[in-house]
Structures are given as C-alpha cells and as structure tokens.
Amino acid sequence: MTVDGTELTKLDEKRLREILNEVRSKSQMRLMSSGHTAAVSRATSYFSDVSYYNEITAGIDYFQSVEQWVREFDSKKGEIIAGLKRVMGALFTRDNMTVSYTADDQGFSFLPEAMKKLSQALPEGEKKTYAVKAPGIRRNEGFTSSSKVNYVARCGSFAGSGYPYTGVLRLLKVALNYDYLWINLRVKGGAYGCMSAITRSGDGYFVSYRDPNMKETNDIYEGIPEYLENFNADERDMTKYVIGTISELDTPLTPSQKGARGLAAWYSGLTDEMVQKERDEILNARVEDVRALSGIVREVLKTGALCAIGNEEKIKADAAMFGAIQPLYNGTASEDGQ
C-alpha cells in the first residue's frame, strides 16, 4: 500500500517498540483512572459479542496482550509484525471503507477528491465480514492491584427473555443513580460513585466507583428488583427523574458529536422514529411503569456476570465471589478464586 509514493507496509522495529510502550503506558493509565469502565467491559464481554470486541481491542484483554508483546518483543517481533500486516491487509481495503464526514457545504466540497485519493491508495480487497463471538463463559474475575479502593461491576442481559425495550429504562438509570444506588453505595457504603444502565441491545450493568466494599456491593445489586417492586415516588420526584432523563437524551451536541452519534445510529439501525418512541415513553412514565421493570432487572442479574478490580486483600477475602483471581498487571490467572 502506498500513499504519495510512501510505502506503508514497511515497519521500523525500533519505532514499533516505542509505539507499543506508549500504548501500554496509556492503556495502563486508562485502567487505573477508569477501573469502573474496565470492569463493565470485562464482565459484559462474557456474553455480548459487541462488548467482547471492545474488550479485545481496548479493554483488559487488550492491555495484557500489549503488555506481553512489550515483554517478549525481541523473541516475538517477527510474529507481531506479521500479525499486524495480516490485519492491515484484511481490514484496510477499498471494499471495506466506510466514511463518516461532518461539515458545512464548503467543507463537503473537499470530500470527493479526498475520497478518490484515499480510495486509489487502498487495495480493492474483498468485502468480507469477520464475525466476533463472545466466549459465552461466565468467568467472574477479580483483578488485583495495589489500589486501596475497588470497582465492582455486575452485568447481564435481558435479550431473548420476552421483555421489550422501553424508554423507561433510561429513567430507571436516573432513579437508581440518584436514589437506591446512591444511598446504599455512596451514602451508606462509602463508595465515591455509582453508575448503571440497561441498553436497547438488552445489555445492562451496575457498577461502583472507588468503593471500599466488595461482596456488600454485590448484595446491594441483588436488592434492586425488590426496590423496584416497592418503588414509590411523588409527582415532584417523577418530574425530576423525567427532566434528568430527557436532559441526557437531548443534550446539545457539537458538530463532531452529532457526526459520531449519526454514525453510531447508522451502524446500529437506530431511526428517528425509534428515538421519538423512547422519548415519548420517558415523558409519559408513571410509577407503575418503573415497578414493571423489576422483571427486566431480574433477568439482567440472572446472567450473573461479575468483575471486580481493586484491592488485593479485599478481593482475596471475598474470593468465593470469583471464578478466577489474577493481578491486573503482569499476572496469570488463579482458578477457583485461589
């Protein structure tokens, strides 16, 4: 592959080593600062194809692969380079190219020539889909580190359970994050924060942020269905939940953000009609609609996918929660929580 006469298939081994070290450093910093995101990614990768792809390209699995490449670069560099070339040749082809471009009319005037130039630089290739399948194994891992706090994620899916998606699930996120989870995890439990979501795909998660607890947090997640069955809120609180949900759904976006949202909608098949239906369900949500979500939450929890990142002593003290425990950095798995 050449661009402006420059051969792009030549790999400088010294520069490649530098890039791998940079990637390892940035990935490690991301895991340290966003342990809640990493824990959710890992737990949902057990059962979700999309999350599995995200995990092997940006999550803990990705970091540990890069870490191994750096550690074994001298003996494995030929294999690494061959693999990178194989991936580049399979993905970066004319037939596989999709372009998302956001600009005003003047900006669009540059697009045809730029795309022609880029297209000519790419090999024609074969339009091929590469299936990525989640392992379907509930590993339930604990990743240990020197951290004093924990990130505890409980994930699952209600897809295939017969329950339809509803916009009220967005309102549930607001209600949980500012009521049940906030009171039990933040106020009573001492966690710095808590997050949750159940998405249109059926995947859902509950996760704590900088949490001193482990098993106690998972027990709180288990109590969500009962909380919903007895859910009550007056008109003022329901209005507050609706406003909070709509403000998140209809947040003003920059042109770049609009382009990214549009591309995501295009890939997922999300239409304006589907978004409006979701908006209407939020605006018309009643207490009874929130109570009716207890079944969906039970299905999510029934999946039983769990991942925790944090303090080694705490994770080992609650080892019965996990199917495997391993160091987050430079480690190999220890099965059955040993």
Task: Indicate residue ranges for each PLM-predicted region.
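Non-catalytic, conformational "gating/processing" segments within enzyme and secreted inhibitor domains
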Residues: 80-115, 302
